[in-house]
Amino acid sequence: MNITTISHLRKYKQRQQKFAAITAYDAAFASLFEQNGIQVMLVGDSLGMTIQGNDSTLPVTLEDMIYHTRCVRRGAPYCLLIADLPFMCYATLYQAYDNAAALMRAGANIVKLEGGGCWVTKIVRCLTDRAVPVCCHLGLTPQSVNILGGYKIQGRDKDSADRILSESIALELAGAQMLVLECVPITLSERIADVLTIPVIGIGAGPVTDGQILVMQDILGITGNRIPSFAKNFLTDSRDIPTAIQLYVQEVETGKFPAVQHYFS
């Protein structure tokens, strides 16, 4: 098995080859995912909700992220591993340097941060200059839930769509290696995926992005009745978890997922 790098994802984008990513939080599931076709994993601060049982990602600490990043890396030594910088862990440049370095030492290949304002762009540039690859996150940014007024679709009106597009361009120019685009209309996703040269991974952003990512609990249907409209329970049509992961990868790569019911017009 070969190690997956950001260069591979850039080549996938150039060839218009879709790829599947998934959240992971422990060694056992990470190993299973890697063995069944997943090349990109995210240790997301979503663990605050899916693992810890909180109602948002805000309580997650850097120590939580370091612990779970180490676990996932042990289980999946070949994947491209993204790790979230949690809430208020990159509020200043020096804080961003120290905390990003800690996640990289724990096994992350790329650190992810949310937002696209001028201060975020500056942090992206400074981290990149110091050899820390950055994945950015626009659209619905869960760490901003209290400002956004809940978990709502973003970029529906022209002004907000233009702002998100402009921010995505600025982040790439600042050195961002990847972009996660969450819960935006497919028309905006298509504009962003077309204009950027870096890989764009969508979640609730339609089939036009270069890759797709879902929370592992949603894919396996272990979130009760709270599966988001943009997600799909792949275990329903599978005999076991490995088969469900293989089906997810296959449907992403062939363009079958996400279907029209999984994105916003």
From Swiss-Prot:
Gene3D superfamilies for the chain: Phosphoenolpyruvate-binding domains (3.20.20.60)
Molecular function in Gene Ontology: 3-methyl-2-oxobutanoate hydroxymethyltransferase activity; magnesium ion binding
Positions that bind Mg(2+): 45, 84, 114
Presence of the UniProt keyword tRNA processing in the record: no
Listed pathway(s): Cofactor biosynthesis; (R)-pantothenate biosynthesis; (R)-pantoate from 3-methyl-2-oxobutanoate: step 1/2
Active site: 182
Localization terms from the record: Cytoplasm
UniProt keyword terms in alphabetical order: Cytoplasm, Magnesium, Metal-binding, Pantothenate biosynthesis, Transferase
InterPro entries according to UniProt: Pantoate_hydroxy_MeTrfase, Pyrv/PenolPyrv_kinase-like_dom, Pyrv_kinase-like_dom_sf
Enzyme Commission (EC) number: 2.1.2.11
Cystines in this chain: none
GO biological process: pantothenate biosynthetic process
Positions bound to 3-methyl-2-oxobutanoate: 45-46, 84, 112
Catalysed reactions, semicolon-separated: 3-methyl-2-oxobutanoate + (6R)-5,10-methylene-5,6,7,8-tetrahydrofolate + H2O = 2-dehydropantoate + (6S)-5,6,7,8-tetrahydrofolate
Domain of life the protein comes from: Bacteria
Class in the EC hierarchy, top level: transferase
Required cofactor(s): Mg(2+)
Gene Ontology CC entries for this record: cytoplasm
Cofactor note: Binds 1 Mg(2+) ion per subunit.
Keyword Methyltransferase attached: no
Description of how the protein assembles with itself and partners: Homodecamer; pentamer of dimers.
Protein family membership: Belongs to the PanB family.
Functional description taken from the UniProt entry: Catalyzes the reversible reaction in which hydroxymethyl group from 5,10-methylenetetrahydrofolate is transferred onto alpha-ketoisovalerate to form ketopantoate.
Annotated PANTHER family: 3-METHYL-2-OXOBUTANOATE HYDROXYMETHYLTRANSFERASE (PTHR20881:SF0)
This protein's name: 3-methyl-2-oxobutanoate hydroxymethyltransferase
